[in-house]
Amino acid sequence: MGDPKTPRRIWKKPKRPLNYDLLMDELKTIGTFGLKTKRELWKAHTELSRVRHQARSLLALGKDMREREEPILMKSLSKIGLVDKNSTLDDVLNLQVSDLLSRRLQTFVHKILYFKTPYQARQAVVHGHVM
């Protein structure tokens, strides 16, 4: 059962952390979105895999059960802006990590307020200049 005081880890490390292609892809994503550590990227990967797993399990269900459960998932994803209201489960399965990371406040600040780098946008958010 575990100790209720200690929180559960919300990220998973990659299976092969020293894969060159994976390292280069991670560094490119970290630089593009101004992430502080790779742990933030792993959190996004884990959250996206959780959502995609829910969509795959809905596809495996029967038609009546699927019609009842699918709007709940789609409503929650459209509420946070990952998919449109009239999208399907295939759109959920086609989501990328960049879609999830582009919903962060520092990414919006970087695009809208025209900071030179995403790291400057991150600093503005952390220091409370942008709320």
Language-model-derived ranges and their functions:
Residues 1-113, 119, 131:
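Ferredoxin-like alpha/beta domains used as RNA- or RNAP-binding modules
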Residues 115, 124, 128:
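Extended polybasic, low-complexity segments that bind anionic RNA or targeting/receptor surfaces
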